[in-house]
């Protein structure tokens, strides 16, 4: 699981919003997407125990 990898997050988010085009809010959406992927990643690594992480 390489959500933590910034390049992976970037391409994942760009793929997710590829139909969005170059509109200014698309860039914001992509940035937000990258941030949330990285946050998920940080939470996962900080809870390095083997317990399943459940969404809040």
UniProtKB/Swiss-Prot annotation:
One of its GO terms (cellular component) is extracellular region. It comes from the Eukaryota. It is found in: Secreted. Disulfide bonds join 4-41, 13-33, 20-26. GO terms for molecular function: mating pheromone activity. The keyword Secreted applies. InterPro entries: Attractin (IPR012529), Attractin_sf (IPR036585). One of its GO terms (biological process) is sexual reproduction. Produced by the albumen gland of the egg cordons. Keywords: Disulfide bond, Glycoprotein, Pheromone, Secreted. Glycans are attached at residue 25. Water-borne pheromone that attract the marine mollusk Aplysia into breeding aggregations and coordinate male and female reproductive behavior within the aggregation. This is Attractin.
